[in-house]
Amino acid sequence: MDAFKLLTRSTNLKTGRAAATSAAQTSRLPSTGKAANPQLFHNSEADRLLEEKKKHGQKRKRGHGADDAGSEDEDAADLDFFSSAKRASTGGAVAGKRHQEQASADKDGDSGSEDGSEMDEVQRRTVLNAHKIKVTDLRDLDQIQSTNAQTLQTEEPKKKKKKKAKAQQEEPKTLTKKEQKKARRLFPQPLVSFKELRTKYKISRRLAENIAEQGFTVPTEVQLGTLPLQLGDSSVQQASKPGETVEPDLLVVAPTGSGKTLSFLIPVINKIVRHHHEQPDERGIFAVVVAPTKELASQIVNEGRKLVQGTGVKITLMKKGMQVVERDGDGDSDEKDVLDEDSADSGSDSEDDEQTTDKKTKGKAPVTKSDILVTTPLLLVNALSANRTKPLAALPLVRNIVLDEADVLLDPLFREQTLDIWRSCTHPELRASLWSATMGSNVEDLAKSTIQERKDLSGTTKSYPLIRLVVGLKDSAIPNIQHKLVYAATEQGKLLGLRQLLHPTARTATDVHLRPPFLIFTQTIPRAVALHSELLYDIPPEAGGSSRIAVLHSELSDSQRSEIMKGFRKGEIWILVTTDLLARGVDFRGINGVVNYDIPNSAAVYVHRVGRTGRAGREGGVAVTYYTKEDIPYVKSIANIIDVSEKLRGAGGEKSVQKWLLDSLPDLSKKDKKELKKHGVKARQSNLKSIKDNKEFRQAKISTKSGYERRMENKKKGAIAASRNRKSQPQAPSTGADSGDDSWSGLED
């Protein structure tokens, strides 16, 4: 028995370890579970308005003509836990009756209207501003003003209509910049809860059940704003003809982990379900979702399959060799090749003929029977162009194209492939939606020009609104995580700091505390492999040893990448070293932190990297960024993002980036920013390997070995290589001394 515990059991004394344990238990981490409220921005006034709207809708639906007092009495009966058995049974009967009435109302088609509970413009403005949602019409001002004039003409009496129309024709007003911004602003009806999708927007019953089964109750900011727009919100129908429901083209900029995938999947699935009911004979690919990486595309398919269960909609991941269109010339060319082979081999028997027909049938894959196709750009372009050997085939049935991580897809790396896919979708009513956490003005301009180009080519006069929705501040990191910018001076200092994260020695107020699982990002694939081999034995065998750490990059095969992702999601892998392959879109909900071992190539990459933690409003995530002496010219953009994120959070306390540091860091020119985005920090570029005596490359090497040890290893490797070369060289021809004539010819004169 511990005497100290016995004597101090009535006191509040705690040992250092116990205090540290209790502090760790009270701190909330992303891995402990989902947040009660997934929203990042909200205040009491907006919550009150949403709660009033929700209660009003519930009373209208539940009452069916009954007064509100009766419903309140029923609620009180349900919540009276200390009543008698008779009263409790009565309350249970009333509750059962109410549930039956609600179920019958749902069965009748959810006829309970929500029109009476709609917010006016002032309330909508209050809610949207509180959640930091800004909705803007990006069309030309002439189109916006003409549409608003048409709306006013239908709403006003006939006498006033003629006078105002004449006045508008006679005196065209030139708007100031402030008035132009005001004219472009829209205030759509916000989504109160996911139940409204069924009661108000009439989505498929089975789709609504699948959403409820996934546990979605409170919509996030991006869902609160975009779902009504895509499902036909009447409050913004001034952007189209009066009385007509029009789905707009969308540009959405929302923080990482805010539920963008669900926001574009629900309207697309519901639209296809309706199309199946209206035209059951027409089948094909009705929607294309484009993502930059295979991991993100696979994740979208997994989320989509949960939503399409029982709806009759099929979602498919694009793979190499899949046929998405049927070409007329393919079958003829195949038959011609087979005939040529038969004529060349005229003496073959019947077995050879059977093998030829089998090869013919097996060689051509069947056309994919899918409603939603999720793909990376190159795979679909190769499928549409037969590996660039034929003109690009058309996808005439596609009515929705979704670009997830649109700023990357419209970057020079993927731009031509993405635009080829966009142009191949030839349906006149094609709607495009672009989604990302970071989107520059160049992406917006490219999207507007592409939409206008499609309109000019098709010759349609019908105009669709182009709406931009921004949540929070553009190009800013999520405010619910803690950012740390750590100066490590050298590569060895970064490695030492990373090992201190893995094995903390002491707890102080300034220390960074990071618990697994977490991600480590590097600049290049060789650096990721080197860091993985360096940390391979840092985890003790009692905790799983080297099996707890893995490396993931694009040079691995698809099966290896999927196995590593599966192990990380299941919790078998605690630390994952990777490149920017996993920086975008991939949803790991339980990640406690992110370590930027190498600084990101741009501010946008930093936003996406640190967005792997703090998903769906989870608190407690940590983002640690190490920088060395070589990184000082490139750090200011990251420091600015951290400063803006902390201001957005509004919480007091010590700042991660002090003002003196922001003032002292140098600014980066546009040319240097472009070079950094394209190649990264010069000292860590992989092409420096070819320069053997490069001092920068030696200093940037990830290793704890001394220079003497590395020199001895290189000497040993060189000796082994020289020995192999000597053995592989052919032996020299024998000379006259070794000719084999053993007879002695005497002494020469």
From Swiss-Prot:
<keyword id="KW-0347">Helicase</keyword>
<dbReference type="InterPro" id="IPR044764">
    <property type="entry name" value="DDX52/Rok1_DEADc"/>
</dbReference>
<dbReference type="InterPro" id="IPR001650">
    <property type="entry name" value="Helicase_C-like"/>
</dbReference>
<dbReference type="GO" id="GO:0005829">
    <property type="term" value="C:cytosol"/>
</dbReference>
<keyword id="KW-0698">rRNA processing</keyword>
<dbReference type="InterPro" id="IPR050079">
    <property type="entry name" value="DEAD_box_RNA_helicase"/>
</dbReference>
<keyword id="KW-0067">ATP-binding</keyword>
<feature type="domain" description="Helicase C-terminal">
    <location>
        <begin position="497"/>
        <end position="665"/>
    </location>
</feature>
<dbReference type="GO" id="GO:0016887">
    <property type="term" value="F:ATP hydrolysis activity"/>
</dbReference>
<keyword id="KW-0378">Hydrolase</keyword>
<feature type="compositionally biased region" description="Acidic residues">
    <location>
        <begin position="111"/>
        <end position="120"/>
    </location>
</feature>
<dbReference type="GO" id="GO:0003724">
    <property type="term" value="F:RNA helicase activity"/>
</dbReference>
<feature type="region of interest" description="Disordered">
    <location>
        <begin position="1"/>
        <end position="121"/>
    </location>
</feature>
<feature type="compositionally biased region" description="Basic and acidic residues">
    <location>
        <begin position="44"/>
        <end position="54"/>
    </location>
</feature>
<dbReference type="Pfam" id="PF00271">
    <property type="entry name" value="Helicase_C"/>
</dbReference>
<feature type="compositionally biased region" description="Low complexity">
    <location>
        <begin position="17"/>
        <end position="28"/>
    </location>
</feature>
<feature type="compositionally biased region" description="Basic and acidic residues">
    <location>
        <begin position="690"/>
        <end position="699"/>
    </location>
</feature>
<feature type="compositionally biased region" description="Basic and acidic residues">
    <location>
        <begin position="707"/>
        <end position="716"/>
    </location>
</feature>
<feature type="compositionally biased region" description="Basic and acidic residues">
    <location>
        <begin position="98"/>
        <end position="110"/>
    </location>
</feature>
<feature type="domain" description="Helicase ATP-binding">
    <location>
        <begin position="241"/>
        <end position="457"/>
    </location>
</feature>
<feature type="short sequence motif" description="Q motif">
    <location>
        <begin position="192"/>
        <end position="224"/>
    </location>
</feature>
<dbReference type="GO" id="GO:0005524">
    <property type="term" value="F:ATP binding"/>
</dbReference>
<protein>
    <recommendedName>
        <fullName>ATP-dependent RNA helicase rok1</fullName>
        <ecNumber>3.6.4.13</ecNumber>
    </recommendedName>
</protein>
<feature type="compositionally biased region" description="Acidic residues">
    <location>
        <begin position="69"/>
        <end position="78"/>
    </location>
</feature>
<dbReference type="GO" id="GO:0003723">
    <property type="term" value="F:RNA binding"/>
</dbReference>
<keyword id="KW-0547">Nucleotide-binding</keyword>
<comment type="subunit">
    <text>Interacts with the U3 snoRNA and is associated with the 90S and 40S pre-ribosomes.</text>
</comment>
<comment type="function">
    <text>ATP-dependent RNA helicase involved in 40S ribosomal subunit biogenesis. Required for the processing and cleavage of 35S pre-rRNA at sites A0, A1, and A2, leading to mature 18S rRNA.</text>
</comment>
<keyword id="KW-0539">Nucleus</keyword>
<feature type="compositionally biased region" description="Basic and acidic residues">
    <location>
        <begin position="167"/>
        <end position="178"/>
    </location>
</feature>
<feature type="compositionally biased region" description="Acidic residues">
    <location>
        <begin position="331"/>
        <end position="355"/>
    </location>
</feature>
<dbReference type="InterPro" id="IPR014001">
    <property type="entry name" value="Helicase_ATP-bd"/>
</dbReference>
<comment type="similarity">
    <text>Belongs to the DEAD box helicase family. DDX52/ROK1 subfamily.</text>
</comment>
<feature type="region of interest" description="Disordered">
    <location>
        <begin position="324"/>
        <end position="366"/>
    </location>
</feature>
<keyword id="KW-0690">Ribosome biogenesis</keyword>
<dbReference type="InterPro" id="IPR011545">
    <property type="entry name" value="DEAD/DEAH_box_helicase_dom"/>
</dbReference>
<feature type="region of interest" description="Disordered">
    <location>
        <begin position="148"/>
        <end position="182"/>
    </location>
</feature>
<dbReference type="InterPro" id="IPR027417">
    <property type="entry name" value="P-loop_NTPase"/>
</dbReference>
<keyword id="KW-0694">RNA-binding</keyword>
<feature type="short sequence motif" description="DEAD box">
    <location>
        <begin position="404"/>
        <end position="407"/>
    </location>
</feature>
<dbReference type="GO" id="GO:0030490">
    <property type="term" value="P:maturation of SSU-rRNA"/>
</dbReference>
<feature type="compositionally biased region" description="Polar residues">
    <location>
        <begin position="728"/>
        <end position="737"/>
    </location>
</feature>
